[in-house]
UniProtKB/Swiss-Prot annotation:
Residues 1044-1146 form the PH domain. Residues 262-277, 470-479 have a biased composition (Basic and acidic residues). Residues 8-23, 35-45, 72-82, 98-118, 134-143, 153-191, 208-219, 240-258, 296-380, 743-765 have a biased composition (Low complexity). Residues 793-822 form the IQ domain. It comes from Dictyostelium discoideum. This is Rac guanine nucleotide exchange factor JJ. Pfam families: RhoGEF. One of its GO terms (cellular component) is cytoplasm. Gene3D superfamilies: Dbl homology (DH) domain (1.20.900.10), Pleckstrin-homology domain (PH domain)/Phosphotyrosine-binding domain (PTB) (2.30.29.30). Residues 1-380, 458-479, 712-765 are annotated as: Disordered. GTPase-activating protein. SUPFAM superfamilies: DBL homology domain (DH-domain), PH domain-like. Residues 50-62, 119-133, 220-239, 280-295 have a biased composition (Polar residues).
């Protein structure tokens, strides 16, 4: 709702007030009923700050409660009026401490006056309400009430204002009520209109009341304030007002002019509008106290006042029309209070107070007319005002809650911080106090022990003195000397103890000062940090502002650039349009030229079609000639085939004879192989290569004879070692002529000249690539078929001679190889050892693969079957036991195949195999780490009777002596075995060997893999050990750290410069500390005592004759130095401890030295002297 509209409505109302001269009569009761139905009154909470009446119950807040939000200073003689509730329609039950609102005469300037129905007043009343119209001013509160009798039942509509008939009826039925006034020890006031205030101003109290004066008069008219005070109505609530007496009739009250009322309403309207715009409530009473009449209507133009005359009322009236001041009469005589009641003869004025001020002028008794239009405007304005007040109240309450909540959170955080700081200081002081008490108790105990020892020595001296009397004077002198020495020692010892106690006290004082300084320093650092953060925030704010300024400047620059670019683009587009126009004209000219070229192409196409027709005719003629030529060639080929079949029969006979000779050669070679196997050198690779090549050549000799078509001499020469098959030259005149088909090549189809040139080039390249041919004497077929020496064919003799020569040459070569292998020169010996190492690698890999296959086929797969069928095993346990066995088996299979391939080739190269597989060997890490974990599970499996039977059956089926445990440990041992075998091969491989680099890199890779596996295994074991110790040691600190690992443990005795850290302990030695524990028989095996750090420690060997070592933590010149002397069970343990300590502390620059006991004593004395100084 716009506030300007509301202000315009106010101006219209003022104009109507000036123009109205006569007001019509209005039925106030029916209008009030309609208003109550349309706008039911909300049930707001009522706070009763007055003292409780004699019959009322105790309120929640008490008589002295003051709302802290609106509390202001108040005098001892006056207080804010208390709101009261009365239901005029029903007259229902009332609670204690609530009063009827129509118990006083409020004389203000009413815009509307209405009649209220008091007929339905048959309801019961609770305490605090009375049946008579009497008011008793007690020491605690003022109580008011009405008579609930049914004599007040006449409706306002039957009231005759001219004849006062209603008055006469009431005069006959109801006696005149009287008001008894007594002196109030505590002046209290009741705000009768606060219940009808707008929602935004509900429960708000104005305590800026003016001090009231007691006077004999019992009625005050606050409308005369304008005569005594300034016209500014804000000062009306700030300066004390002088009460004035009113006459017995309502006509004697002073009135204010309509002009003053309109001015006041305008000023208050403008002020409230200003506060509404600013979002803050006004400090003036017009903003905080919005008093409304009983039907919550806004001020309207002046209407005549409805007055009900009570013949029995007295001549005095008590008027309640000011929310901030209330007068209470104090007089020895009885005074009558005029109530707005039909039975009353006095004048009662009902005012309707608004939020812009009060018009306290009275009207004539006879004017009761009202304009119907003004009431419709009044209801509309009332709705607007209610909506505005509700909205304002919600916003104000929300802001107040947020403000209070922020302060509450701040105070809570501040209190928590102070409590935390106080708690830390108390804890520090408590620790210091406990430490001092412990130290003083320890010193007292030591002194008591020393006194007991001195007493024992005195007793011993007395006994010795008694015995010495018998011996003589010499013994007496000796005893005296001993006594003096003891006394002297006692005095020295006492001095030493006192010095130590003084030292401890000094140390404690120094520690306290250090703690205080540390706390002060910490607070200073925190303040500096806060200041720094504040500076940073300021600098960030400045930087942000500068950045915004820069961004704004850059944005402007960019906009200017964009404008320039747009101009350039427009210019470019214009130029582009010109270019497009030029291109368009050019394209039109090109189109004309293209049309001409199309016509020329059409003419050329027609000429080409004519030429193609002529060529087709020529091709058909050429095809016919080719068909005739093919027929002729087919006849020639058939004749040649017949002749070839005859020749093949002859060649078959010749091949059979050669097979018999080859069989003889194979038998001889088998004998030689058997002999070589029986020799001392077994499985030599060069020999195997040579034999395999001979066998292969012998097997391939018949096929080569067939391929060369009876070229016997050439096939025999091809069987020689280290010779390739020879293709004889065609120009040779000594080649046998097998058939005319081969001698005379068949006619071929004519080929284009380009293909013929390509074939010739290929033949020339083949001839260039061929090796030089060994010239072998050849014979013609006639010469070979000749019979010599009666029964032998010349060709057969030639063949036998050639075979014999080859056999002799081969035998000679074998003898040379044997001699070379049996020789003892270093080179041969090195080659032999290398071959043995390679062969061992292959044989062990083969055996390892066989073991993995047995483990898979006879244990892993059957166990999975049993787990599914008989539930003898669990699938989870099987997977844990065998881990990644399948992956390892696959790798071993591939390595075995590759080794077999490489061993069949000379020279043997195996290094690249392991270089290739080295990264894959990391899968062994999972198997190795899992092996120790599954050992207990596997043991439990084997101990089960059914499982034990299963494992024995599978072992018998596998026909292997090894059990499952031996098979499972093989993958763990395989990687170290690779390293040993490759190291042996590298040892026997010379640097100039082809395989040296690969073997070396393979050995280094496998070595790194083994180191990686061992490190991972060590980390897993160390973590398991740390977890075990964490569980065993009670109250132990956090042991599991990434850099920490366990070294050893031992029982020992410790002597330290702190007596509480001395005694017999059990030590756990880690790489960075020594954990001191004691054995315990309760919930854990060990109990944590303290820790000896090794970071800045110095390890010393006291003597070589004992089993003690000393650990010094810190510098000897420092006060906080710690010295621990550890006595180990034996010298052997001492040596092992020193060795481990030297290994763990050497990288940190700490050396372990050997010092004699005298040197250590001297250093301890120097340390004690430095402390005394």
């Amino acid at each position: 709702m716009s506030y300007e509209y509301y202000y315009q409505q106010q101006q219209q109302q003022q104009q109507q007030q000036q123009q109205q001269q006569q007001q019509p009569t209005f039925d106030y009761a029916s209008y009030y009923d309609n208003q109550q139905q349309q706008h039911p009154q909300p049930q707001y909470p009522v706070y009763d700050h007055t003292a409780q009446s004699n019959d009322s119950q105790q309120q929640h807040y008490g008589s002295s409660y003051v709302d802290p939000t609106y509390a202001t200073t108040s005098t001892t003689q006056q207080q804010q009026q208390q709101p009261s509730i009365y239901d005029y329609n029903t007259g229902g039950n009332r609670n204690s401490g609530q009063y009827d609102q129509y118990n006083t005469t409020n004389t203000t300037t009413p815009n509307t006056t209405q009649n209220y129905d008091y007929s339905n007043t048959s309801g019961n009343r609770n305490s605090g309400q009375y049946d008579q119209y009497t008011t008793t001013n007690t020491t605690s509160a003022n109580t008011y009430g009405y008579d609930n009798s049914k004599t007040h039942s006449p409706t306002p509509s039957s009231y005759d204002y001219s004849t006062n008939s209603y008055y006469s009826q009431q005069q006959q039925q109801q006696p005149t009520p009287t008001v008894a006034a007594t002196n109030n020890t505590t002046n209290t006031s009741t705000n009768y209109d606060s219940y009808y205030q707008p929602p935004a101003q509900r429960n708000s109290y104005d305590y800026s009341q003016t001090q009231q004066q007691h006077s004999p008069t019992s009625s005050y008219d606050y409308s005369q304030v304008t005569n005594n005070t300034a016209t500014n109505y804000d000062s009306y609530y700030q300066q004390p007002t002088t009460p004035t007496s009113t006459s017995s009739s309502s006509s004697t009250t002073t009135t204010t002019t309509t002009d003053n009322q309109s001015k006041f309403e305008k000023s208050q309207s403008l002020k409230n509008m200003d506060h509404f715009i600013k979002g803050t409530p006004s400090n003036t009473p017009s903003a905080t106290i919005n008093s409304w009449d009983y039907n919550q209507q806004q001020p309207q133009p002046q209407q005549p006042q409805s007055v009900y005359n009570n013949p029995s009322s007295s001549t005095t009236n008590t008027t309640y029309n000011n929310p901030s001041t209330t007068t209470t009469t104090s007089s020895p005589t009885n005074t009558n209070t005029t109530y707005n009641n039909p039975s009353s003869a006095t004048n009662t004025n009902y005012n309707n107070r608004n939020s812009w001020g009060y018009d306290q002028s009275t009207y004539n008794n006879s004017s009761y007319n009202n304009n119907t239009d003004t009431y419709s405007n009044q209801t509309q304005q009332q709705e607007y005002q209610v909506l505005y007040d509700k909205k304002y109240q919600e916003e104000e309450e929300k802001r107040r809650k947020e403000y209070e909540e922020s302060w509450r959170v701040y105070y809570e955080q501040q209190a928590a911080y102070e409590k935390e700081q106080e708690r830390i200081r108390n804890e520090e002081m408590e620790k210091i106090r406990i430490k001092h008490e412990e130290e003083s108790n320890r010193l007292k105990n030591e002194l008591e022990k020393q006194r007991d020892e001195i007493q024992k020595m005195k007793d011993q001296l007395v006994q010795q003195q008694n015995a010495s009397k018998k011996k003589g004077e010499e013994d007496l002198k000796q005893m005296e000397q001993a006594k003096q020495a003891a006394l002297q020692w006692q005095q020295e010892e006492m001095k030493r103890q006192l010095i130590e106690v003084q030292k401890e006290r000094d140390l404690s004082r120094k520690h306290e000062e250090q703690v205080r300084l540390a706390l002060l320093e910490e607070q200073r650092v925190i303040k500096e940090k806060l200041d720094e953060k504040q500076q940073q925030l300021i600098s960030q704010q400045q930087a942000f502002q500068s950045k915004l300024h820069q961004d704004e400047c850059s944005r402007k620059v960019e906009e200017e650039k964009k404008c320039e670019e747009m101009k350039k683009r427009e210019f470019e587009l214009l130029e582009r349009n010109k270019e497009l126009d030029a291109l368009k004209s050019k394209l039109q000219s090109d189109l004309t030229t293209s049309l001409k070229s199309k016509e020329d192409l059409e003419n050329q196409r027609k000429a080409l079609e004519e030429t193609t027709l002529r060529e087709k005719k020529e091709i058909q003629i050429y095809k016919q000639s080719i068909d005739e030529e093919t027929k002729r060639k087919k006849l020639e080929i058939e004749q040649a085939r017949q002749q070839e079949e005859k020749k093949l029969k002859e060649q078959q006979d010749h091949i059979n004879r050669q097979k018999e000779m080859v069989d003889c050669q194979q038998r001889e070679l088998l004998v030689q192989i058997n002999q070589s196997k029986q020799a001392t050198i077994d499985s030599l690779q060069p020999m195997r290569n040579m034999l395999s090549t001979l066998n292969i050549n012998n097997k391939n000799s018949p096929a080569s004879n067939i391929a060369l078509k009876n070229k016997d001499d050439q096939n025999i020469n091809d069987n020689l070692p280290q010779q390739k098959p020879v293709i004889p030259s065609r120009n040779s005149s000594h080649l046998p002529k097998l058939s005319p088909t081969i001698q005379q090549p068949q006619p071929q189809q004519e080929q284009p000249p380009q293909q013929q040139q390509q074939q010739q080039q290929q033949q020339q390249q083949q001839q260039q690539q061929q090796q030089p041919v060994k010239i072998v004497k050849t014979y013609t077929q006639k010469e070979l078929d000749q019979i010599v020496d009666g029964n032998y064919r010349f060709g057969d003799i030639i063949r036998v001679q050639r075979v014999s020569r080859k056999w002799l040459a081969r035998k000679k070569f074998k003898d040379l190889v044997k001699m070379k292998l049996l020789s003892n020169d270093p080179e041969t010996e090195n080659m032999r050892n290398r071959f043995k190492s390679v062969n061992e690698l292959y044989s062990t890999e083969l055996s390892y693969l066989n073991s993995l296959l047995i483990l898979r086929d006879f244990y892993f797969i059957p166990m999975e079957v049993e787990a599914r069928v008989t539930k003898l095993f669990k699938s989870e346990e099987i997977n844990k036991v065998f881990s990644n066995l399948k992956s390892i088996l696959q790798i071993s299979t591939e390595i075995t195949h590759l080794l077999e391939e490489r061993l069949s080739v000379s020279p043997v190269k195996i290094g690249d195999i392991f270089v290739k597989f080295a990264p894959i060997f990391k899968i062994y890490v999972e198997y190795v780490n899992n092996f120790d974990k599954v050992a207990p599970q596997l043991k439990a499996m084997t101990e089960n009777p059914q499982s034990k039977k299963f494992f024995s059956e599978q072992r018998n089926k596998s026909r292997v002596a090894t059990d499952i445990n031996s098979l499972l440990i093989m993958p763990v041992q395989r990687c170290p075995r690779y390293e040993l075998l490759l190291r042996e091969i590298l040892k026997h491989t010379q640097e100039d060997h082809v395989e040296f680099k690969n073997i070396k890199s393979a050995y280094e890779s496998i070595k790194d893999i083994n180191k990686y596996i061992n490190d991972r295994k060590r980390n897993v074991d160390n973590r398991a050990k740390l977890l075990e110790l964490q569980k065993e040691i009670k109250n132990a600190p956090e042991l599991i750290e990434s850099h920490r690992y366990f070294v050893r443990e031992s029982q020992c005795n410790i002597s330290a410069n702190k007596k509480s850290e001395s005694g017999g302990f059990y030590l756990f030695f880690f790489n960075d500390m020594v954990l001191v524990t004691k054995k315990s028989s309760l919930f854990s095996n060990y109990k944590y005592v303290y820790t000896i750090p090794l970071k800045n420690a110095d390890i010393k060997d006291i003597s070589s004759n004992d089993s003690m070592i000393r650990i010094i933590v810190g510098s000897l010149e420092s006060i906080d130095v710690l010295i621990y002397t550890i006595s180990l069970p034996s010298k052997k343990d001492k040596e092992s401890w020193l060795q481990d300590l030297s290994v763990e502390l050497k990288p940190k620059g700490i050396e372990i030295g050997q010092y004699s006991s005298s040197q250590l004593l001297e250093s301890q004395v120097q340390f004690s002297n430095s402390k005394t100084k």
